[in-house]
Structures are given as structure tokens and as C-alpha cells.
A protein has these predicted regions:
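Activation segment
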Residues: 82-83, 96, 111-112, 125, ...
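A short, compositionally biased
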Residues: 45-48, 113-119, 165
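The feature marks short, hydrophobic/small-residue-biased sequence motifs that occur predominantly
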Residues: 50-88, 135-136
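Short, well-structured beta-strand/strand-turn elements
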Residues: 32-35, 85-90
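"Rare, low-scoring activations can occur
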Residues: 16-36, 105-106, 128-208
Length: 208
């Protein structure tokens, strides 16, 4: 399915400081890996930001109908965490600008591109035009249910979505069979530390 979702969980806190949990979740004995809260889980959240575009390189005439692209923050550790496979170019790192993007094959095909590196798609808002330049392409991965059509998706540096990151999640992996134990430990942290916040805690395999 193009991405890792087995033994993968994620937790977010609204009205609570998730940053305080980074080290605590990573230190849980059943957790094998945890990423800092700079990202959103592919499942079930997906993109928290969408843009409408109607123009991209090699388009013969500007399309009447606009395409919706989901924009997700991501850096090397995110691509590695989910096992997303790079087909060409590079993944997003700190040397990239906020408008550098990695897209998947499906988005590349929708633009009619055989080769996407260095090409751009354009977003217009209030008469201002922004260009997003493709620096990498990853293999398709299915993050929606098998019956629904895959969305168009682009990954960009988290600095481009800073205003959303107070809602970001800690993504983590846990030992085989340890989900219930893991969930209980995180629920206890929640009750002890942020009882008035709203917690979202998911096992990505169960949500798919």
C-alpha cells in the first residue's frame, strides 16, 4: 500500500501543550520510535491545509475547473517513518524553501507530467500568485479507504505551515501487540497532565 501503517499511532492535544509530551512518549517502554510534533498523521487526519489551483507547467490552457491539493508538512524523518519511497529527486529537508514540494505519482499524472522535477504548479489568492516547485516524487501510497479516489497531495517544509502546528501530532511506533498498553499509558498522561484538553489518539491501522 506504499506506506507503513502497522503498529503506528499518533496523538494530538488541543488546548494542551503537546511539546511537553515529546520526550515522555518516546520514553514509554512499548514505544520504539517517536517523531517531534511537527507533523500531522497521514491516517486519519491527512492534510490540514488545502489549496485550489488551476494552472501548472505544461498546461496547454488554464483550466476552468480548479484542482484541490492537500498540503502536508514533512521532512526526512516523516518520509522515513512512513516508509514513503522516493522515486526521483529528494525529500524535503532544512535546506528547502517553504514552496518546495514533494508530490506522489498520482498528482504527477494528474498534471500530465512524465517528468516532474523542477516543474511548478501555481496558486492564486487575492491577485497574488505563488509557485510551488517540485523537488521530489514519491511512490503512490493509499491513505484513503480502498473504495475512495486518492486525493492530490504535496508535502512541504513544516515552516510553511507554522500557524497550524499547535495542532500537530506526535507520531510514534509501538511494539507488536502493545497497542492497549500504549493507549492506557497515554490516557494516564492525559488525565494527569492535561485533563481539560481534548486528546486525539489513534492507531493508524485500525483507522484505515
Amino acid at each position: 500500500l506504499g506506506m507503513e501503517r502497522h503498529n503506528v499511532g499518533n496523538v494530538a492535544l488541543w488546548n494542551g501543550d503537546i511539546k511537553q509530551w515529546s520526550a515522555k512518549i518516546a520514553a514509554l517502554p512499548m514505544v520504539t520510535e517517536a517523531l517531534p510534533p511537527s507533523y500531522f498523521p497521514i491516517i486519519p487526519t491527512g492534510p490540514m491545509m488545502y489549496i485550489e489551483i488551476n494552472n501548472w507547467d505544461d498546461l496547454l490552457k488554464i483550466s476552468e475547473e480548479s484542482l484541490t491539493i492537500g498540503m502536508m508538512p514533512a521532512k526526512e524523518d516523516f518520509f522515513e517513518f512512513y516508509g514513503l519511497k522516493l522515486l526521483e529527486g529528494e525529500v524535503i529537508s532544512d535546506k528547502n524553501q517553504g514552496n518546495d514540494v514533494v508530490i506522489d505519482e498520482n498528482t504527477c499524472r494528474r498534471f500530465g507530467w512524465k517528468q516532474a522535477l523542477g516543474k511548478s504548479f501555481y496558486y492564486e489568492w487575492n491577485g497574488q500568485r505563488s509557485a510551488y516547485k517540485v523537488v521530489g516524487v514519491v511512490k503512490n501510497f493509499s491513505y484513503r479507504s480502498p473504495t475512495s479516489k486518492p486525493g492530490l497531495i504535496a508535502f512541504q517544509h513544516p515552516k510553511a505551515q507554522e500557524y497550524l502546528l499547535n495542532r500537530a501530532s506526535i507520531l510514534f511506533k509501538f511494539r507488536e501487540g502493545a497497542w492497549n498498553e500504549c493507549r492506557e499509558a497515554i490516557e494516564k498522561l492525559y488525565k494527569d497532565e492535561f485533563p481539560n484538553a481534548y486528546m486525539r489518539l489513534f492507531n493508524e491501522e485500525k483507522e484505515y
